[in-house]
């Protein structure tokens, strides 16, 4: 049976500290760092929970002009 899981993708828009601007969106892990394999990404059961993490990140100091976020879904075998 396939179920839908959600992943947060991010892309840095400006240079900030050790971050350099990125051309493409990357899946993010639990700590908000880009991962090379999608299996290492942080998965969320609902879209709302993933969006809630983005909202918390925005209120704790990462503005929209610095990092862009997207929530995408993937069908996973269970």
Regions found by a protein language model. Give the residues of each.
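Short aromatic-glycine-(Arg/Gly/Cys) micro-motifs in beta-strand/loop hairpins
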Residues: 2-40
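Short, mixed-charge low-complexity intrinsically disordered segments
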Residues: 40-78
